[in-house]
Swiss-Prot record:
<feature type="modified residue" description="Phosphotyrosine; by EGFR">
    <location>
        <position position="159"/>
    </location>
</feature>
<dbReference type="GO" id="GO:0030032">
    <property type="term" value="P:lamellipodium assembly"/>
</dbReference>
<dbReference type="Pfam" id="PF00621">
    <property type="entry name" value="RhoGEF"/>
</dbReference>
<dbReference type="InterPro" id="IPR036860">
    <property type="entry name" value="SH2_dom_sf"/>
</dbReference>
<dbReference type="GO" id="GO:0005886">
    <property type="term" value="C:plasma membrane"/>
</dbReference>
<feature type="domain" description="Calponin-homology (CH)">
    <location>
        <begin position="1"/>
        <end position="120"/>
    </location>
</feature>
<feature type="modified residue" description="Phosphoserine">
    <location>
        <position position="576"/>
    </location>
</feature>
<dbReference type="GO" id="GO:0005154">
    <property type="term" value="F:epidermal growth factor receptor binding"/>
</dbReference>
<keyword id="KW-0728">SH3 domain</keyword>
<dbReference type="Pfam" id="PF00017">
    <property type="entry name" value="SH2"/>
</dbReference>
<dbReference type="InterPro" id="IPR000219">
    <property type="entry name" value="DH_dom"/>
</dbReference>
<dbReference type="GO" id="GO:0001784">
    <property type="term" value="F:phosphotyrosine residue binding"/>
</dbReference>
<dbReference type="GO" id="GO:0048010">
    <property type="term" value="P:vascular endothelial growth factor receptor signaling pathway"/>
</dbReference>
<dbReference type="GO" id="GO:0008270">
    <property type="term" value="F:zinc ion binding"/>
</dbReference>
<feature type="zinc finger region" description="Phorbol-ester/DAG-type">
    <location>
        <begin position="523"/>
        <end position="572"/>
    </location>
</feature>
<comment type="subunit">
    <text>Interacts (via SH2 domains) with the phosphorylated form of EPHA2. Interacts with SSX2IP. Interacts with NEK3 and PRLR and this interaction is prolactin-dependent.</text>
</comment>
<comment type="function">
    <text>Guanine nucleotide exchange factor for the Rho family of Ras-related GTPases. Plays an important role in angiogenesis. Its recruitment by phosphorylated EPHA2 is critical for EFNA1-induced RAC1 GTPase activation and vascular endothelial cell migration and assembly.</text>
</comment>
């Protein structure tokens, strides 16, 4: 038997792969095993299974999706533990790219074989490999795997469940249904049951399971929380039990309301669920912190004998020790995701009931709640990934979460339109920007932040050719990112045509998120937005889900909406003059731009109108005392708000002036960094009480150079002269700008050490808005730990990655139709893995794996992807 097949069987014996994984199929090829291991998740699981506690689960990215960064981090984590904990030498291991790019899969097999021969593995009683002579020619077996890797995605689906979720359901059934199963079975076995009988049966199940659930919560509080307060710090208590006390209070009231409703026939039960929808939102916090709770609990059990003994003592008091604390903490998440299923069953037996319509509304409310909770969990995981990106990029002075959700990352070659040199770069694509970096070992040096709002993407068909050199393929598949106002653009080159297609698709999706087609429907001006409080969509009334950039907000009237609902939102109540042109409103006076304006600073709560020096605008609205005016570009007809100080009246003939106005003619008083006339000593006194990175631009009227930058850095205030010469402005000859504004915007993102080696800081905090910036930062701090699905580890600590016999999540399989459904609502995909729906679309369902997380996989209109299961109605199911 080939060595790679023996490796696959050994991984099955270690409970890393399921028994019927494709690697044991007669048709299997070595790439099937390579594909299963490429993201590093299963290798990390292997170490955990061999030696629980040897690997810190917080270091594993269980769903790396399309991220090369996260896959390589997993592989490096595996290699480090192999070296540090299992004693393997570096020469016995492999380079991360040997696996990720499948450059040398033979080395990977060899390293896994050495693990199988380790005493830790031997003590498990698992037969090592190779256990027999192999006759394969390694070079032949592993040849061309790197090309296959270029052509195939890692086969992980972000919405797939993990196998232990079934185990979680088993625990839930044991704990919650243990008392009602037999009565229910006897009830259902009666002959001639009417619909009312079945309805009463459903009511009984809702009532009794809720009562049992509430008793379970009380058991946790009485038998675990109270005793453990004596041995745990408040911080550890909060980490393990999260907001369980709040859940208990809510369910005390919820159970009483259910009891009252069922006692009078259940006709008001729908209203009970509708009334409690908002209060049940606290499950978002509970579910999203479950991973951290489980990890904290496991670490405390492993490190503190007094705590372990106390927990064992507490366990014996709860149902005779049948369930561990780890089991019980799972139950709340399972329970809240069951409510819509219970109501769906009740609705199916309430066809003739007068409260049927309200039951439908209650069902939709609980489906919406389940989706909200799942999206909060998903966003917590996303924020954790963003945090890892953040910590790995040097010179990055902005919070990556401000740029939306990550789409894809990886290595491309980049060439700017100005600089024609093709350079190796690592790209992180987000909804709003693409971060261009240079790789430095395991970290990255920031080179450029490209804002997608000001760019468009075009194909480069001239470079679509497969050119090979003696040492491999050239990166010859290209596309462009072109600046909308004619500034510097970029050309990107991919290794394969398939890689180019994926990158272009992700760019298109990101751009559609930040600039939706219907953003200005019905005179609104919608922008992607993070809502501080739970908000309902103005159109469909359902939650805007998640924890950041949950949807879109109109900058005029402030209403929120899903992406798919933008076109059906009622007309904006604050219609601007630009929207009334059709009704005969004439254009205002023409103005000419005295400087470039790229949206920084941004008008508070208003859409931005960007322009360049010399552009002509029509003034639509402008109070002489206001720092912000509304206008419209004559050439493009785009409208929005801009600093009133950046324009001046156009000459009578309507033509803009030829030359760029000098900085002395521009009024910068509207900007939070401009201090006006200020002496050096006065500046020192002003800035010394501020945080490092706080800066201002001041005028030096008595000096040859009019402006100076003053910035606090490492407890000192530094001063930099701004030179104006030959119609350019700069602080170093190497980097020149059109205006002071452009110079400031550049050094807000790029370190001053480019010009002054000892000054490694950007222009962080404008001195006028320092307090406001600090307030915003504190209200938007990223989560310290985001949630992957905690059920990767079952309560017994068994395998957390096998997907089950039908369809492992890492495998590539031919879709099989298992049902059809009709879309009840519109749904706009935010990601290339998602499937957009229009109301009435017929969807062929390929997989319900992921249903507990709210997502199914299917096909409609020629596209395959994941969609919210609550947005469709299965045909044949009432």
């Amino acid at each position: 038997m080939e060595q790679w097949r023996q490796c696959g069987r050994w991984l099955i014996d270690c409970k890393v792969l399921p028994p019927n994984h494709r690697v044991v199929w007669p048709s299997a090829v070595v790439f099937d095993l390579a594909q299963a291991l490429r993201d590093g998740v299963l290798l990390c699981q292997l170490l955990h299974n061999l030696s629980p506690g040897s690997i810190d689960l917080k270091d594993i990215n269980f769903r790396p999706q399309m991220s090369q960064f996260l896959c390589l981090k997993n592989i490096r984590t595996f290699l480090k533990v192999c070296h540090d904990k299992f004693g393997l030498r570096n020469s016995e291991l492999f380079d991360p790219f040997d696996l990720f790019d499948v450059r040398d899969f033979g080395k990977v097999i060899s390293a896994v074989s050495r693990l199988s021969l380790h005493s830790i593995a031997q003590n498990k009683g698992i037969r090592p490999f190779p256990s027999e002579e192999t006759t394969e020619n390694d070079d032949d077996v592993y040849r061309s795997l790197e090309e296959l890797a270029d052509e195939h995605d890692l086969g992980e689906d972000i919405y797939d469940c993990v196998p232990c979720e079934d185990g979680g359901d088993d625990i839930y059934e044991d704990i919650i249904k243990v008392e009602v199963q037999q009565p229910m079975i006897r009830y259902m076995q009666k002959m001639g049951m009417t619909e009312d009988d079945k309805r009463n049966c459903c009511l009984l199940e809702i009532q009794e399971t809720e009562a049992k659930y509430y008793r379970t919560l009380e058991d946790i509080e009485k038998n675990y929380m109270s005793p453990l307060r004596l041995v745990l710090s408040p911080a550890d208590m909060a980490a393990v039990f999260i907001n369980l006390e709040d859940l208990i209070k809510v369910h005390h009231s919820f159970l009483r309301a259910i009891d009252v409703s069922v006692m009078v026939g259940g006709s008001t039960l729908a209203k009970v669920f509708l009334d409690f929808k908002e209060r049940l939102l606290i499950y978002g916090e509970y579910c999203s912190h479950m991973e951290h709770a489980q990890n904290t609990l496991n670490q405390l059990l492993a490190s503190r004998e007094d705590f372990r003994q106390k927990v064992e003592e507490c366990t014996l008091k709860v149902q005779d020790g049948k369930f561990k604390l780890q089991d019980l903490l799972v139950v709340p998440m399972q329970r809240v995701l069951k409510y819509h299923l219970l109501l769906k069953e009740l609705l199916s037996h309430s066809a003739e009931r007068p409260e049927r319509q309200q039951l439908k509304e209650a069902l939709e409310a609980m489906q919406d709640l389940a989706m909200y909770i799942n999206e909060v969990k998903r966003d917590k995981e996303t924020l954790r990934k963003i945090s890892e990106f953040q910590s790995s990029i040097e010179n990055l002075q902005v919070k990556l979460e401000e740029f939306g959700r990550p789409k894809i990352d990886g290595e491309l070659k980049v060439r700017s339109i100005v600089n024609h040199t093709k350079q190796d770069r690592y790209l992180f694509l987000f909804d709003k920007v693409v971060i261009v970096c240079k790789r430095k070992g395991y970290s990255y040096e920031l080179k450029e932040i490209i804002e997608l709002l000001f760019h468009k993407m075009t194909d480069d068909p001239m470079n679509n050719k497969d050119v090979k050199k003696s040492h491999g393929k050239m990166w010859s598949y290209g596309f462009y990112l072109i600046h909308l106002q004619g500034k510097q653009g970029f050309q990107f080159f991919c290794k394969t045509e398939d890689m180019k297609r994926k990158w272009m698709e992700q760019f298109e999706m990101a751009m559609s998120n930040i600039k939706p087609d219907k953003a200005n429907a019905n005179h609104h001006s919608f922008q992607m937005y993070t809502f501080d409080k739970t908000t309902n969509c103005k159109a469909c009334k359902m939650f805007l889900r998640g924890t950041f950039y949950q949807g879109y907000m109109c900058t005029k009237c402030g209403v929120g909406a899903h992406k798919e609902c933008l076109e059906v939102i009622p007309p904006c109540k604050f219609t601007s003059p630009a929207d009334l042109d059709a009704s005969g409103a004439g254009p205002g006076p023409k103005m000419v731009a005295m400087q470039n304006y790229h949206g920084n600073p941004a008008p508070p709560g208003k859409p931005v109108l960007t322009f360049q020096t010399g552009d002509v605008l029509e003034l639509l609205r402008g109070d002489p005392e206001s720092p912000w005016w509304e206008g419209r570009l004559v050439q493009t007809r785009k409208s929005g708000y801009f600093p009133s100080s950046s324009v001046k009246p156009c000459p009578v003939d309507g033509r803009p002036p030829i030359s760029r106005p000098p900085s002395r003619e521009i009024d910068y008083t509207a900007y939070p960094w401009f201090a006006g006339n200020m002496e050096r000593q006065q500046t020192d006194n002003l800035l010394k009480s501020h945080a490092s990175g706080t800066y201002l631009i001041r005028e030096r009227p008595a000096e040859a150079e009019r402006f100076a930058i003053s910035i606090k850095f490492n407890d000192e205030v530094k001063h930099i002269k701004v030179v104006e010469k030959d119609n350019w402005i700069h602080i170093t000859e190497a980097k020149k700008f059109d205006s002071l504004l452009e110079l400031v915007e550049y050094y807000q993102c790029h370190s001053l050490k480019e010009s002054f080696k000892q000054l490694d800081t950007t222009l962080k905090y404008p001195y006028k808005s320092r307090e406001r910036s600090a307030s915003r930062a504190s209200s938007r701090s990223p989560a310290s730990c985001a949630s992957y699905n905690f059920s990767f580890l079952s309560p017994q600590g068994l395998s957390f990655a096998s997907q089950g016999p039908s369809a492992p999540f890492w495998s590539v399989f031919t879709p099989r139709v298992i049902g059809t459904a009709v879309a009840r609502y519109n749904f706009a995909a935010r990601d290339m893995r998602e499937l957009s729906l229009r109301e009435g679309d017929v969807v062929r369902i390929y997989s319900r794996i992921g249903g507990d997380q709210g997502w199914w996989k299917g096909e409609t209109n020629g596209r395959i992807g994941w969609f919210p299961s609550t947005y469709v109605e299965e045909e044949g199911i009432q």
